[in-house]
């Protein structure tokens, strides 16, 4: 039997008029102030945010573990009008998993991202939007992560990492699609389900 599989990679860039702070506020269902645009982004009325967490390398300055400080610092570091502010994985959880199992699966995925790239990851699990007629089992997560890694001083490094850039981006995305499918199957098996996903 097949379980649900969805994994996509998106970019959040200023060139499209987007703000990393606004995106983070929406995904976490919080009220954050975006210093770059001088705007308050209030999504506290948004329902269906099941879980949020910020994952970061151990030596990260503690101020960067605060959602508002983190994304405002990202906005400040990127001066160009077309700057790439963050990347995002959008994933769907197999419908078989419960809240605790979804959280464990998200933790593993985000910790892998931190380990591989040394970046800060801001993740949120959302309940399905049942009013829009979507499949009600489709719990999904938005996983935003920084385009710069954390250096030995616990701050953003001067250079952006290139893994997702034009040269080897396709390969990187294929790798993550594959490892996400493996992660889904591992968690399905671990929790006693026969269903598997195929990417």
Locate the predicted segments by residue.
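N-terminal nicking endonuclease/strand-transfer module with a His-rich metal-binding environment
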Residues: 1-199
């Amino acid at each position: 039997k097949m379980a649900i599989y969805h994994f996509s990679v998106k970019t959040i860039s200023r060139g499209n008029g987007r703000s990393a702070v606004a995106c983070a506020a929406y995904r976490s269902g919080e009220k954050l102030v975006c210093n770059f645009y001088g705007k308050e982004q209030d999504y506290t009325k948004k329902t269906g945010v099941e879980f949020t967490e910020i994952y970061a390398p151990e030596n990260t300055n503690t101020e960067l573990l605060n959602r508002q400080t983190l994304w405002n610092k990202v906005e400040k570091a990127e001066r160009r009008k077309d700057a790439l502010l963050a990347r995002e994985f959008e994933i769907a959880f197999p419908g078989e998993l419960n809240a605790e199992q979804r959280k464990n699966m998200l933790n593993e995925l985000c910790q892998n991202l931190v380990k591989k790239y040394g970046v800060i990851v801001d993740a949120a699990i959302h309940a399905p939007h049942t009013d829009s007629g979507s499949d009600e089992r489709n719990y999904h997560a938005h996983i935003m992560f920084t385009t710069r890694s954390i250096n030995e001083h616990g701050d953003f490094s001067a250079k952006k990492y290139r893994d997702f850039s034009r040269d080897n981006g396709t390969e990187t995305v294929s790798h993550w699609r594959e490892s996400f499918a493996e992660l889904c199957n591992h968690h399905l098996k671990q929790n006693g389900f026969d269903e598997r996903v195929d990417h």
